[in-house]
């Protein structure tokens, strides 16, 4: 009898070790999910939910909550099992790095985050989260937007109070002139990472060359300086000298300019116009809709999806990301696509014709785009330069 029990114990240990060896890691599951159909992923997701799983996801953009609601309607057996929590950009990576793998209840299974350089540094490079992108979408999303996967682009534009008529802004170097002192509203870049990343991109070779051209067009002479490394640094210096930091959020900048002094201008998130009282919206003009601007008309930044390395529902995460990359997940009433200032990386998803906006392709040549690799490699020098001038 003892021998039989010993054999059974050994067999159980062998089976247990085999089960562990056969257990699929999150990374392996996401790799497998990339080539599956949505129907196959749904079956896998139902298995995860039946086993007690729940997809908790954090997002820096509130429209993700509506997308999650639509997702559960389209996949009814996942109803109430996709739980949204809004997270502020400034605390995103502090929360995620401290909770992923900690066993904290309702920690994120996936997140929609901005600030690509921090995503790379604190999560992806550390193996705390993984990128996932479906093979079925590779023909409609540019390769540059697949790893890490972009869910939406958001733009910030130059917008002004038109109470005194046009400000005739045709060149970004105008904003470095003394006449703009205190009249340009911009959120403190040391407290708003996408604003910081925008300024850092201006120091890159491509953008400094573009600013050199704008400089020569405006001043009638080539850019020359012994003080600044390139035209990007020079523009940042002049611009920040004029910035007014009274307002601490994009929504407050939008409403403050709309109800404030004519002639004031802000560089803020375009979609925040929805926060402005309807009676005041007539006071606001998007510079780019009035005329072309030498240099740029604002900037564009991505929101990425990333999957936590300890999620118990990787297939559900994959299905949800697939959904967000489609018209069903990105569009509809009260969605990203029904509002100004949000653009899908899926080139087949177009902005509604009745919306005062332009497609992604239009903005792609007029806005400064975030390059997470350039920022990651040049962060220290550019940050010090900017922080000193913010004061």
PLM-predicted stretches and their roles:
Residues 54-72, 83-97, 105-258:
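Extracytoplasmic ligand-binding site segments that recognize negatively charged/polar headgroups
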Residues 24-34, 39, 361-391:
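Conserved C-terminal helix/tail region of periplasmic/extracytoplasmic solute-binding proteins
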Residues 6, 15-28:
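Sec-dependent signal peptide cleavage junction
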Residues 299, 303-372:
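Mature extracytoplasmic/periplasmic domains
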Residues 1-9:
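Positively charged n-region of N-terminal signal peptides that target proteins for export
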